[in-house]
């Protein structure tokens, strides 16, 4: 599923996993189009701002955009690997039990779109449970 987000970044893919530690951080893996068939793929650890229900950047890293004849093919492949990797991390952490995650799209529209992505494409289910730290709605998936 492709998500339109604005002129500066044509499409983005996000998967979010909370790291419910003392720093209240979340791990985000993403892929974003920068136009011309070029994509940035990356991941970041963000601090959860309880007051404003938003994410504050604390660390982020990206792969350099490929410069060969088919940049989009290679970098989209990396994007898919990033999404698979986050699924594996969640699966290992859950040990076959339900794993809850939450989505923060920085604004209400993005939050709805990311929630739809996870429920439709990645088979997450909506839950009445909310995030311990920021009261965002949780999604869950039985893994393993």
Name each region found by the language model.
Residues 1-144:
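Non-catalytic substrate-recognition and accessory regions of acyl/acetyltransferase enzymes
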